[in-house]
Design a protein with these regions (language model features):
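Active-site cavity-forming subdomains of large catalytic enzyme subunits
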Residues: 1
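Thiamine diphosphate
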Residues: 7-13, 21-38, 43-224
């Protein structure tokens, strides 16, 4: 009835319940007592369950709450002042150099636009974003859409630069072939974390892009 519809509209549970899940939540994921109560209650009931837990990135540390992108992956640092440890503080990275250069070129050429998949800071695009916000597009964790979107922009005369980590570019291989390569669209792929990436762990090793991109005849350039 109306009560059930109201509950579903409020908690967005319809999709999960339509799939046969019992929906619970949303609850505060930072409240350990509440979270434990919910988990114990769910475990005592039969059937599949969906627990909706709401959290905030960086919760409890003001600098991270204010700027979560800068705290996506960090080394040791002075917690009181949010200053990196001098012994592990990174030198100017490839991503920073690239980001500053693209930002400069964006000021010289209004056709240039930047696209990323939830990696604005990781690919150095924060500079372009602040200077050219109307030509910056973060599509979220949707690499396939990022590539197809870039092909669409290129077809209309724009010069899209797609900035994605090598290991995540693999997800969009079908779109690279069909939407960019076969249609001969002018899209630039700025591939971050290419090659061996010790600091980012096993999942972020960019060791396949030379093989799968050269297979479809895409020119590959690497800074010396």
């Amino acid at each position: 009835g109306g009560k059930s519809m109201g509950r579903r509209a409020m908690y967005h549970s319809t999709m999960f319940e339509d799939m046969g899940f019992h929906y619970f939540g949303p609850i505060d994921g930072h409240d350990e007592a509440e979270l434990e109560r919910a988990l114990r209650a769910i475990c005592s009931q039969p059937g599949p369950h969906f627990l909706h837990v709401v959290t905030k990135k960086g919760k409890g540390y003001a600098p991270a709450e204010a700027n979560p992108g800068n705290f996506h992956g960090v080394s040791t640092f002075d917690l009181a002042h949010s200053i990196p440890d001098p012994e592990v503080a990174p030198k100017e990275s490839f991503s920073t150099v690239f980001g500053n250069l693209l930002n400069k070129q964006g000021s010289e050429n209004e056709k240039i636009c930047a696209i990323t998949a939830a990696m604005k800071y990781g690919t150095g695009l924060q500079f372009f974003y602040h200077t050219h916000p109307k030509r910056f597009f973060d599509v979220g964790m949707a690499e396939q859409h990022a590539v197809t979107f870039a092909a669409g922009l290129a077809s209309q005369g724009m010069l899209p630069v797609v900035c994605i980590y090598s290991t995540f570019l693999q997800r969009s291989y079908d779109q690279i072939i069909h939407d960019v390569n076969l249609l001969k669209e002018n899209v630039v792929f700025a591939i971050d974390r290419a090659g061996f990436v010790p600091a980012d762990g096993e999942t972020h090793q960019g060791i396949y892009d030379p093989a799968f991109l050269s297979q479809v005849g895409m020119p590959i350039y690497s800074p010396s």
